[in-house]
C-alpha cells in the first residue's frame, strides 16, 4: 500500500460520510400509556418508511465497502519496483530522496564514490529516511536498501563478508593455511 493510499485513508477517517452530513431528523418516539386489557397498543405509522431508509443506507454502505475491497485487491496485484542507483556525487542524493518520497524502494550502490562522499551522502539519506519514516538497511559493503514505511526487509540471513570472516579470502573461498 502506497503512502498516498495511507494518506487518503487518513483523510477519509476524519471526513464525514455523505449520510451524516444530512440534517438530523428527529423521529417521533412512540408514547407508552397504560393499556387496559381491552385495548391493543397503537404502533407508529411511520415505522415501515424508517426500515426502508435503513435498508437503503445499508445497501449504499455495502456497495461502498465492496468498491473499497476491489480497490485494495487491485493495489495488491501491483508490481513492486526497486530502483537501483549508483550515485557519483553528493547532489545525486536529492534524487534518491525524491524517489523515497514517491513511495519507491531504492537500492543504492556507493561503489563510484569515495568513502568520505559516501558517508556524507549516507548521512543525508539517513536523515531523510527518518523524516519520511522509511527504512535504511545495509545489504553489502557498498550497498544500502532504502525503503518506504510499508515495505518490510528481512536481512537477518544476509551475512556481510566483513562481519564474520577475517583474512584475505572471498565469500566462498577457503583460507590457505600456512604450514
Swiss-Prot record:
Where would one find the signal peptide in this protein?
none
Domain of life assignment:
Bacteria
Q: Name one GO biological process term.
A: division septum assembly
Keywords (A to Z) from UniProt: Cell cycle, Cell division, Cytoplasm, Septation
> What protein family is recorded?
Belongs to the SepF family.
Q: Which Pfam families match?
A: SepF
Record's keyword annotation contains Repeat: no
- Where composition is biased (Polar residues), the residues are 34-55
One GO cellular-component annotation of the UniProt record comes to: cytoplasm
Record's subunit section: Homodimer. Interacts with FtsZ.
Question: Chief localization class?
Answer: cytoplasm
Disordered: annotated segments: 18-55
Localisation: Cytoplasm
Q: Does Cell cycle appear among the keywords?
A: yes
The molecule here is called Cell division protein SepF
Protein's job: Cell division protein that is part of the divisome complex and is recruited early to the Z-ring. Probably stimulates Z-ring formation, perhaps through the cross-linking of FtsZ protofilaments. Its function overlaps with FtsA.
